[in-house]
C-alpha cells in the first residue's frame, strides 16, 4: 500500500486550567489518543458536536498547536513538534469557515494569492502573477477579479479565493474547517462541487471538519465521529451512514436536519443547461 499522506498515532491534547477560590486546578482532555491514516486523493470527514475535539484535532494536524502526546507523519515523515520546518508547514494548508477574517482587506486578491509564492519560492514577479491568475481560473473566477479587494466579493467568491490561496504552494493535504457552514445552501453546493472537481483534477487530499451531516455524506470517503475527545466511530461513508454502530452516532444522525445536497446540485445543473 502507498505511504499515507497523513498518519496520526495516538494523538492527545491536554489543557491545564488554573484553579481559584474553592476551585481546584484540573486537566481538560480535549483529544484522547486519536489515530487514523489518510491516503492521497481521499477525504476524511471529522464530525461531532461543539466541544467534541474536532477543532483541537484540526489545530494539531495543521501544526498550529503541538500535541501533548502522540505522533503526526506527513508523507511518511514524522513531524517534530518542537521544531516545525517551513517545508513541513507548506505541506498542510487550512481553509477557515469565515474567509473574510483571513483575507487582508487592504490587499488586492492577486497579491493575496501571490504572497505565499513570494515568501516561499524564488519565482519571478511575472511567474507569480501567472500562477495566481491560473489559480483564479481554476476556482471559477477570472482575470477581472485579480485587482479587486476582498469586500468586493460575495461570501462564496471569498471562499473560492481562500481555497485558491491554500493551493498555491501545492500542499500535501488541506484541512477544511467548516468551509461551507456560513454559506447559503445553493452556494454550499457550488463550493462542494468545486472541491470535488479540484480533488479529481489534482488528486487533492482533504480533512473536512463539519457538523453538517448532509454535507459530510456528499463530500466524504471516510467518516470519523468524535465525542468528548474520543473517536467513537470510524469507517467508510456508506458504512457509517448506512449502519452506524455507536449510540452517539445514532443520536447525532437522528438529531440532524437533513438537507438534500444532491437535489440542489441537480437543480443547479439544470439551470446551467438552460442558460447555455
PLM regions with names:
Residues 20-25, 78-93, 111, 119, ...:
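ABC ATPase NBD coupling module
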Residues 168-172:
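A short, proline-enriched helix->beta-strand linker immediately N-terminal to the Walker B motif
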